[in-house]
Amino acid sequence: MRGKKQIAAVVLAVIFAVTAGVPHSTVYAEPDSTGNAQAADAAADDTQKEEKKEEDMTPEELEKKAEEDAYKMEIQSNSWKNWPQGPGTYGEVAIVMDAGTGSILYAKNIDGHEYPASITKVLTSLIALKYGSLSDQVTFSNDCISFMQPGDSSAGLKEGNVISLEQALYATLLASANEAAYAVAENVGKNAGHDYNWFIQQMNEECKSLGGENSNFVNANGLHDDNHYTCARDMALIGREIWRYPEFLKICQEQSYPIPASDTT
């Protein structure tokens, strides 16, 4: 919400189970060899489960194991002196940063390399807003479309379409349109007297200027590349910076945004 500082509070509830003491009869049971055998079998089953190799696990078991392993990972902020204990998460990385001060309130593996996928488009939008104008024209070249594969996020834009930068950013952020993100980068780069690669260079330089040290961006839409990576801390710094742009906040407040067919030609 513009003009207001937003604070997200995580409330941890601790529930105590209390058993009240009430009068009851005392019952003694004879030792049960069957029960002992069942207990031994259960213990053996538990040991077997623990020793089960990953290659023998089903996809569901592998997913569950990955979640459990992630949950057990260290939360760095829990070791800070006089700092509240944060909750566990099933994600391998997590961060909470105060957008006003940049203070980190919660940290879990925040410098670990991760593939950013479509959140790359947040940085793409930041560079577009920094170097472009919302009224600029964005023309879709063959390069903006040719890499698209079936199933890729798209707004259905075609080669030769011409829309405004504002419309292209709506498509990039609301529809996560990969062709729109590419077109934004290509056109903003050209309007600055350069090209798409210059735009990617600005993405990396901007990240470093904000204090990012563990990122490398090679495209504007986040489609997978082994050399395209970031970390939670760097993305939080990028998010904090773009929070200063009211145009970005306006776009993010919308649930849908129509682009008239007449505007694409």
Question: Which stretches of residues belong to each language-model region?
Answer:
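Sec-dependent N-terminal signal peptides
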Residues: 4-16
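A general structural signal for well-ordered secondary-structure junctions
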Residues: 17, 134-135, 178, 213, ...
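Active-site-adjacent loops and short helices of periplasmic peptidoglycan-processing enzymes
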Residues: 30-35, 41, 45-233, 237, ...
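Sec-dependent signal peptide cleavage junction
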Residues: 19-35
